[in-house]
């Protein structure tokens, strides 16, 4: 039986994710204690082929060993995938303020901020097992549902999807990144007044960066690093590999380098999605 476990931070969108999976045809179970999972899956396997189960902080044991043991038992008999939903701290605080709901750990007389931080510590062992980490900070419910459908399609095809994304450090590191490369030490087109309004997707900026040996060397060495370990990552039953390239504002250097890396792996026949987070963010503004 195929089992999708949905977990993540409270307020990150687990209920939306579970509804999206239900619409896709999964039999869904919301918030069952982890200890009851083996018994539940034994019963469901007699009548269901695809099940989605939501786990929140109230139903996850504080012991990492207990979590490991339960997941190991399930994996012996079923195909398990774990989807972990993330969002940045400020977004979670805003969502709780908007909904006027209590955080599950606020019942322990913690402030909302303290409850969010403590929850993250509890959930850390589960993050280590996640097949997909989705940062919902800037995702609408519609896009979140589409990302989940993409994951399920890619999962059925058993092909690793590479996401190469540029970002600006001043906006924060993407929470869903598997690898983060900092390119702030490279020559910056920002200091050229004619290049400043442009982006790393435009020819004059690309020509400026391509003219510097250190930029080309960085791209070559980064490609070589990923090429070296990609075969092992593909064998590791992953569905997504997210590579984040960051510069100060996410407008010039990171955009150019992310585009170069993404196009390189596309040319090698890999399934690649190129995203420019800070450019998309500024478009919305």
From Swiss-Prot:
Residues reported in the UniProt entry to bind ATP: 8-15
Keyword annotations from UniProtKB, A to Z: ATP-binding, GTP-binding, Nucleotide-binding
Pfam families: PapZ_C, RapZ-like_N
Record GO terms (molecular function): ATP binding; GTP binding
Disulphide bridges: none
Sites where the protein binds GTP: 56-59
InterPro entries attached to this UniProt entry: P-loop_NTPase (IPR027417), RapZ-like (IPR005337), RapZ-like_N (IPR053930), RapZ_C (IPR053931)
Function: Displays ATPase and GTPase activities.
Record family assignment: Belongs to the RapZ-like family.
Name of the protein in question: Nucleotide-binding protein NTHI1314
Source organism phylogeny: Bacteria, Pseudomonadati, Pseudomonadota, Gammaproteobacteria, Pasteurellales
